[in-house]
Amino acid sequence: MLDRTNSEFEFRGVNHLALVCKDMAKTVRFYRDVLGMPLIKTIDLPEGSGQHFFFDIGNGDSLAFFWFANAPEGAPGIASPQALPGHGSMITAHGSMNHIAFDVPADKFDA
């Protein structure tokens, strides 16, 4: 097997993933209050165009969200899946994010 270690950049993992949310308050309530992820940073974007905020997901990694004041509505089937598994297509467009999965111990969730 080839050694594919990157000697130029010392990649240590993913610093953060950034998604776009429709409602900042609901997003914060879910990730902070339901999932227990600490909200660690909030940035107001220039000219009142929105906010960028970060949740601690452990191991020095973050899950980030943008909220844009004038963002267009989502486009199911293009930017997000049209349906849940078993209920229709899970296909999304190139460059879109289909889902995010968190690594948690099996005894901490009900499958």
Where are these regions (language model features)?
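A detector for short, charged/polar N-terminal pre-domain segments
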Residues: M1-F9
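Vicinal oxygen chelate
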Residues: L2, D23-A25, Q82-A111
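Short aromatic/hydrophobic contact patches that present stacked aromatics
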Residues: H16-A18, F54, H99-A101
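Core-facing hydrophobic residues within beta-strands of well-ordered domains
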Residues: F11-V14, M97
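Core segments of cupin and vicinal oxygen chelate
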Residues: V20-P72
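A broadly used, surface-exposed interaction patch
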Residues: P72-A83
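Aromatic-acidic/polar surface patches that form glycan- and anion
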Residues: E10, V20, F102
